[in-house]
């Protein structure tokens, strides 16, 4: 070993393993001892080692304190969570203890509210008692009537009859609750005064009930459904309109006479019977002629009976608005579908009929023209004693008769019935004075069918460009298409035969023949109707749309594609040939009657 190496080893301090790992400072050397500030004493190895040890100890102390601070912070967080949880538990225990200590609160229903005043000497001299002068509530508690004081914390202006209040152990009202909208459903019969209403219960009995403050008595009308609290005999709330009431509150439709085709003569009859008495009532009074109270529209289905009734209502509303400019006069169309009124409970259908006419009278008294329209009239008012039903009509028919007779004093109500089986309606309904005017809505003839076709085939539809060019104009093309479709529909050729009926004319009253069978061929036109014509037009439109889509798929020019004669003729064929079954017997009998054939229908067969 050299002298230099020995000197280095002798001058270099030897530290333990822990110290070497803890300190990253360089070892002391002679060169470091010689590099000192000018004028200062050189640092010895012992002093340098002492400084390093102090630094190492300080770092260890700092790390230890950091660990202690982190531990203290974690303990503090857990302590805060524990205190919060304990506080929540204490609050729960306190609330539970308060509930256990507080006595239960009884409930009472307010019957009357009296806002009192301070007693005066004059009132004492008049032998008045605090029960008469002070603020109090008349309530019902467990079936007993009581007069109780009111806590000053309750605002008396918020208390109304019918509300529920809570009572403390001193029987003092301390908390006000809302009115309970529950109870038996009853019907308003008559409003007696500002506080009393006569109602009909479900058992048929009548009761006089008081009205809760939450119910506006001025809005109550005869026939309204309300809830009755049987404990206090108080009406608490109004029940929304029932299904039958919603049916009769339909406003005026927008159908006009111009939208009905092929029924010009029938429409003229109806307008003369309905509109003239309304427009010129003074002339009818001079002649002592009462306007008709009812109209019966009968005939095969699908020929516009419902549309006529709607047009009557619309026309009356327009006339009323013209006669009373600036007023709020409007028309109402009460559309009643017969089967929807039938109910399994006895008396329920009759009640709904009463509701209908109550609504009609209310609107009429306000000056509004009202049309009460009974569709499928035979379903409700069948002939009594016919044995064709469960005899439910024995009470329904008299109810309608009473209501129609009650409309006599009203000037703005007219009843319109529609049926395709007038032979099933009770004769008392059909007699003059109830349904005065009876109009048969026949199937359209060829001219009427062309008029109906014109309502559905308009100039704004896309038409076949070839046919438009050949006709010279859109209007001319439409006229040609309609003529072709109507001609095909009413053609009487073997290809358009629809049914063959065998009739025994010997069954005619007065005929002495034993048997006289005859066959009659019925054609497509014998079963045409407005609904059938609309279906034909719809089929033609679908065929034109399909043809246009095929042209677009093939990449061809589809601008010239539109409804053409070929589509209409194919639609006429498909409308009847796609029906596998023969027409129903009532339709066949009706077609034979129109053709003047009388007798008993023996059989019906498809044409050969």
Swiss-Prot record:
<dbReference type="GO" id="GO:0019941">
    <property type="term" value="P:modification-dependent protein catabolic process"/>
</dbReference>
<dbReference type="GO" id="GO:0000502">
    <property type="term" value="C:proteasome complex"/>
</dbReference>
<dbReference type="Pfam" id="PF16450">
    <property type="entry name" value="Prot_ATP_ID_OB_C"/>
</dbReference>
<dbReference type="InterPro" id="IPR003960">
    <property type="entry name" value="ATPase_AAA_CS"/>
</dbReference>
<keyword id="KW-0175">Coiled coil</keyword>
<dbReference type="InterPro" id="IPR022482">
    <property type="entry name" value="Proteasome_ATPase"/>
</dbReference>
<dbReference type="GO" id="GO:0010498">
    <property type="term" value="P:proteasomal protein catabolic process"/>
</dbReference>
<dbReference type="Pfam" id="PF00004">
    <property type="entry name" value="AAA"/>
</dbReference>
<dbReference type="InterPro" id="IPR032501">
    <property type="entry name" value="Prot_ATP_ID_OB_2nd"/>
</dbReference>
<dbReference type="GO" id="GO:0005524">
    <property type="term" value="F:ATP binding"/>
</dbReference>
<keyword id="KW-0547">Nucleotide-binding</keyword>
<dbReference type="InterPro" id="IPR003593">
    <property type="entry name" value="AAA+_ATPase"/>
</dbReference>
<dbReference type="InterPro" id="IPR027417">
    <property type="entry name" value="P-loop_NTPase"/>
</dbReference>
<dbReference type="InterPro" id="IPR041626">
    <property type="entry name" value="Prot_ATP_ID_OB_N"/>
</dbReference>
<dbReference type="Pfam" id="PF17758">
    <property type="entry name" value="Prot_ATP_ID_OB_N"/>
</dbReference>
<dbReference type="InterPro" id="IPR012340">
    <property type="entry name" value="NA-bd_OB-fold"/>
</dbReference>
<dbReference type="GO" id="GO:0016887">
    <property type="term" value="F:ATP hydrolysis activity"/>
</dbReference>
<feature type="binding site">
    <location>
        <begin position="302"/>
        <end position="307"/>
    </location>
    <ligand>
        <name>ATP</name>
    </ligand>
</feature>
<feature type="coiled-coil region">
    <location>
        <begin position="45"/>
        <end position="79"/>
    </location>
</feature>
<keyword id="KW-0067">ATP-binding</keyword>
<comment type="similarity">
    <text>Belongs to the AAA ATPase family.</text>
</comment>
<comment type="subunit">
    <text>Homohexamer. Assembles into a hexameric ring structure.</text>
</comment>
<dbReference type="InterPro" id="IPR050168">
    <property type="entry name" value="AAA_ATPase_domain"/>
</dbReference>
<dbReference type="InterPro" id="IPR003959">
    <property type="entry name" value="ATPase_AAA_core"/>
</dbReference>
<protein>
    <recommendedName>
        <fullName>AAA ATPase forming ring-shaped complexes</fullName>
    </recommendedName>
</protein>
């Amino acid at each position: 070993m050299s002298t230099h190496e020995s000197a280095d080893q002798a001058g270099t301090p030897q530290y333990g393993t822990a110290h070497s790992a803890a300190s990253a400072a360089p070892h002391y050397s002679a060169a470091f001892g010689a590099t000192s500030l000018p004028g200062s004493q050189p640092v010895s190895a012992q002093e340098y080692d002492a400084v390093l040890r102090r630094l190492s100890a300080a770092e260890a102390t700092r790390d230890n304190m950091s660990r202690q601070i982190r531990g203290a912070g974690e303990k503090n967080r857990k302590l805060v969570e524990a205190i919060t949880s304990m506080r929540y538990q204490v609050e729960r225990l306190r609330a539970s203890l308060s509930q256990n200590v507080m006595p239960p609160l009884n409930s009472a229903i307010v019957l009357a509210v009296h806002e009192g005043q301070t007693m005066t000497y004059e009132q004492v001299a008049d032998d008045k008692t605090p029960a008469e002068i002070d603020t109090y509530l008349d309530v019902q508690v467990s079936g007993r009537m009581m007069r109780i004081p009111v806590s000053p914390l309750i605002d008396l202006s918020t208390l109304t009859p019918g509300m529920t209040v809570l009572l403390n152990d001193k029987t003092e009202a301390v908390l006000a609750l809302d009115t309970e909208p529950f109870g038996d459903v009853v019907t308003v019969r008559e409003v007696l005064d500002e506080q009393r209403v006569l109602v009909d219960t479900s058992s048929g009995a009548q009761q006089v009930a008081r009205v809760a403050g939450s119910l506006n008595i001025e809005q109550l009308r005869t026939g309204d459904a309300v809830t009755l609290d049987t404990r206090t005999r108080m009406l608490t709330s109004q029940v929304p309109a029932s299904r039958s009431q919603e049916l009769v509150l339909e406003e005026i439709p927008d159908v006009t006479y111009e939208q009905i085709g092929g029924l010009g003569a029938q429409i003229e009859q109806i307008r003369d019977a309905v509109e003239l008495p309304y427009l010129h009532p003074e002339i009818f009074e001079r002649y002592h002629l009462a306007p008709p109270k009812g109209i019966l529209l009968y005939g095969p289905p699908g020929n516009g009976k419902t549309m006529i009734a709607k047009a009557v209502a619309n026309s009356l509303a327009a006339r009323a608005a013209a006669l009373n400019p600036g007023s709020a006069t409007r028309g109402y169309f009460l559309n009643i579908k017969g089967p929807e009124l039938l109910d399994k409970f006895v008396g329920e259908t009759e009640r709904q009929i009463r509701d209908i006419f109550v609504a009609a009278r209310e609107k009429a008294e306000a000056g509004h023209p009202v049309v009460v329209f009974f569709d499928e009239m035979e379903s409700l008012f069948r002939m009594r004693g016919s044995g064709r039903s469960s005899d439910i009509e024995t009470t329904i028919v008299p109810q309608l008769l009473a209501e129609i007779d009650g409309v006599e004093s009203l000037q703005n109500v007219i009843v319109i019935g529609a049926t395709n089986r007038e032979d099933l309606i009770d004769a008392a309904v059909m007699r003059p004075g109830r349904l005065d005017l009876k109009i048969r809505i026949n199937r359209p003839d060829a001219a009427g069918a062309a008029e109906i076709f014109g309502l559905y085939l308009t100039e704004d539809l896309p038409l076949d460009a070839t046919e438009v060019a050949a006709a010279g104009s859109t209007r001319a093309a439409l006229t040609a298409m309609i003529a072709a479709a109507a001609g095909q529909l009413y053609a009487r050729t073997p290809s358009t035969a629809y049914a063959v009926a065998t009739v025994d004319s010997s069954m005619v009253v007065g005929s002495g023949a034993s048997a006289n069978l005859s066959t009659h061929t019925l054609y497509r036109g014998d079963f045409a109707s407005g609904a059938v014509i609309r279906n034909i037009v719809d089929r033609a439109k679908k065929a034109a749309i399909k043809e246009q889509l095929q042209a677009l798929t093939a990449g061809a020019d589809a601008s010239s594609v539109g409804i053409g004669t070929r589509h209409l003729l194919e639609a006429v064929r498909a409308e009847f040939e796609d029906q596998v079954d023969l027409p129903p017997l009532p339709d066949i009998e009706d077609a034979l009657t129109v053709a003047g054939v009388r007798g008993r229908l023996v059989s019906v067969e498809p044409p050969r």
